[in-house]
Amino acid sequence: MFHKRILTRRDKFLLLSLIPVYFIVCGFILQPFSEIWPGIATLIKEPDFLITDYFVVGGVGAAFLNAGVLTLLSIALIYFLDMEMDGHTITSACLMFGFSLFGKNLFNIWAIMLGIWLYAKYHKTHMSHYVYVGLYGTSLSPIITQLMHIGDLPVAARFFLALTAGITIGFLLPPLAAQVHHAHQGYSLYNVGFAGGIIATVIVSLLKSFGITVESRLIWYTGSDFLFFTILSILFLGMAAGAFYFGGRGVVAVSYTHLRAHET
């Protein structure tokens, strides 16, 4: 029962996919089906600047569905690019899920990913070299939504502006992320976040120079503490059980070794 099991590449990706699937199922349980799709539409149409809590904007079920589907798509993208699972895979999936609860949605991430793809094509390299930069760089996705709400421009003009901005962001992120690494010499854990912050500062400054003000928001969900405690407890207990099932006695041995090392 407690023997270590060898996982194939496919098994690893399927296991990681269980987390977003779990939240998608929770979403359908927590919100009526008839309310989820209007909730998703509201998430896409609403401005996404901080703080815009999707639990309030579209409902808990719609927020979980949005985050779960985006995370599944991110995992699938990495899988079908024939990449091996590593720390970046897990980190990017978890960040995608977390920030898809406030800011990223099924509409606004794709222009940036298209820019990343065009950058790879321009340099005649495989998309796998830059996919994690793209997934981390979707932290700038709220800019796409914000540009769709500019003034009295026609919808087609706003869409073209948002698409162009997203592609430009995606195209600039890989070289900028490589350069800012030299600035902090590895002392920033969020290298793409640093690069994204620079791009966001420039874009907001440009908007202000054209008289377009970016209003901050404070839409924050409160309550349902026991509900989320229950949902997360089931998830974490399942993850622990999975670790024992697939890792065998080695999980206990490694945990005990780390505990003794900290004590000494």
Predicted regions and their residues:
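N-terminal signal-anchor module of multipass membrane proteins
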Residues: F2-F102
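Hydrophobic core segments of alpha-helical transmembrane domains in multi-pass membrane transport
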Residues: L16-Q31, L70-I78, L95-F99, I116-W117, ...
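Hydrophobic alpha-helical transmembrane segments
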Residues: S74-F80, M96-K104, Y119-K124, P142-M148
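Membrane-helix interface "capping/anchor" motifs
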Residues: I78-H88, G103-I109, K121-V131, H181-S188
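Alpha-helical transmembrane segments of multi-pass membrane proteins, especially transporters
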Residues: T91-L95, N108-I112, I116, A120, ...
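Membrane-interface helix-loop-helix junctions at boundaries between adjacent transmembrane segments
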Residues: I143-A165, L173-F228
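Membrane-interface capping segments at transmembrane-helix boundaries
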Residues: Y245-V254
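Conserved small/polar residues in nucleotide/adenosyl-binding loops
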Residues: T257-T264
